[in-house]
Amino acid sequence: MSIDLTRREFATIGALALGARSWGQCNADRLATPYKLGRQVLSASGQQGQFDSLSVDGPFVFSHEGRFYMTFIAFDGTGYQTGLASSANLVDWKKEGVILKRDPSSPTLRYSVALGWILRENGLYSPGKLKPVDGHFLGVYQVYPSQGYEIGAGMIGVARSKDLRQWDAAPPVLRPEDGAEWERGGLYKPCLVESEGTYYLFYNAKNHTDWPWREQTGVATAKDLKSWTRFAGNPIIPNGPPGSMDEIFASDPCVLQDGSRWAFFYYGLDAKGVARDFVATGPDLTHASKCAGALIDVGPPGSVDSEYAHKPSVIAWKGDLYHFYCAVSQVNGKEARGISVARSRPWN
């Protein structure tokens, strides 16, 4: 999900303290990607009437048939739609157009539809190939009930495709009103993992529909992709204590297997309005301990990510980790929101 103008009014934030787990219970050195490319690899078109006219956001990167692909969320003033881009080297990207459009005739997809994840290999250092089920690729999406930028209480659903270009979005399977108090305000970015015959649907959610609110990350499970059970121990990635770097948001999960453990990449938002990417690790898919420090921090004034460096998507290639994220800065007094990347090895 994204930070809009209302969510930047942090002067109104009280010193609310939600359940927190301590930092520093894991070592994130092997997951570090300190070498930023320093520019956007995917940008808004700036062309009025185009689906990506105002911003591109929310990357999900994978490999397929010998190439790399990225789904991304585009905003045109009405709502989100989902685009696809391709690359041979994870740096030079070409947009291929819209793959999941809003549908004015649909009560669910009328204003927006944002594909956040497609079921892929679990391994962090795997090629990141997709995992078809019954001849279809499985994706998970988020939608919002009103026109505008993430307006209203979001919901999550499952979508299917045979070719990655045309998607059939089924009705939502997770709704905020069916959840606990921490998620009653609306659901955000989904992440779908299959392990030992069980599907795990990770998502972040907010406790109030209207600002101010807090966001945390939880998980639901299913065998059939239809009947989902929320984990009793949610949220599995809660907000940190007052003064921490994820005091306000702990959001946008990207969950991958790192050997015998799981890595839960996510972004945190602090009370000053700074958004950064972090990671937690755990022995299974329902327990996570936060690692100390940011994996991707904001850059200095004038840099591509001087305002926000958030919303992780991680893939490995030739032994290197590539950490894609939404980079936000100000250019000529206007927000420049696009996709950038950092990796584990220097670029030169």
Task: Report the location of each language-model feature.
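Conserved active-site neighborhood of enzyme catalytic/cofactor-binding cores
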Residues: 313
